Design a protein with these regions (language model features):
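A short Gly-Trp-Pro
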Residues: 1-107
């Protein structure tokens, strides 16, 4: 779930992180819970204003209604949600996608 960095904070505890190359070759900083090593969120270093949050780690995952799926080129056909935007890889304009998510959240 993409969101703007200014709208995101970790509510409790600290995370561990590591930098890994993403599909585009750019570095992504992946944050994990230090106790269970579950990924919580990812910073896309090429897009410093955007954070990718894992919805299952939210206190209220109901706020994470999908509006799009990325990297569908690697997904099984049964895993692609109907009625959402699909991108075979990363979308060209991530900020526009985040804006669409925010508009959906406010609706």
């Amino acid at each position: 779930m993409l969101t703007f960095r200014k709208d995101f904070n970790v509510l409790s505890g600290e995370t561990l992180w590591r930098d890994l190359p993403g599909g585009s070759g750019g570095l992504h900083r992946q944050h994990v819970c230090p106790e269970c090593l579950t990924r919580t969120h990812t910073e896309m270093l090429a897009h410093p204003d955007v954070i990718n949050v894992r919805p299952g780690t939210l206190d209220n995952p109901a706020v994470a209604t999908p509006i799009a799926q990325i990297w569908t080129s690697l997904a099984h056909s049964w895993a692609i949600a109907p009625n959402v935007r699909c991108y075979e890889e990363n979308p060209e304009d991530i900020e526009a996608l985040v804006g669409a998510w925010r508009a959906n959240l406010m609706a």
